Amino acid sequence: MQIEIKDGRSDNSPLPERKLVTLIQESYDSLKDDNEINLSTESTSNLLIKLVLEKLEKHSSLYKYIASVTTLNIEGLNEENANFSLKNDIGASWESKKDGIFNYKLEDKNSNECYLITILWLHK
């Protein structure tokens, strides 16, 4: 078994990278626009994961999907006061020709939050 360490692998994605970005952004926008969801009590990251996974499953049932969201509160951070550090590593055992990973950073300036989104797909 060959083990590879890479920053990301989206060239074999079930969707083009641009479509993945659009899917994530549309999912987030629909959360913000839904007046029935109280984002002060509901977990934005959990709702975002649910919407993204539902949309991915509609595109292809040939894959299993995993979505992860890391939420950063960036309120009060500026160029003089940017004293936080975040490191997230993930590993998987997969077939590199069929499986892959995509990372995306989504910022919401209105809520002072930043979402680091990771999507993995594993061919069934």
Curated annotation (Swiss-Prot):
Which family, according to the similarity comment?
A: Belongs to the TDA2 family.
One GO CC term on file? cytoplasm
The protein depicted here goes by the name: Topoisomerase I damage affected protein 2
Locate the transmembrane regions by residue number: none
Q: Which InterPro entries match?
A: Tctex-1-like_sf (IPR038586)
- Compartments in which it is found: Cytoplasm; Cell projection
Give the keywords, sorted: Cell projection, Cytoplasm
Q: Does the keyword Cytoplasm apply?
A: yes
Q: Which Gene3D superfamilies match?
A: Tctex-1
Q: Which domain of life is it from?
A: Eukaryota
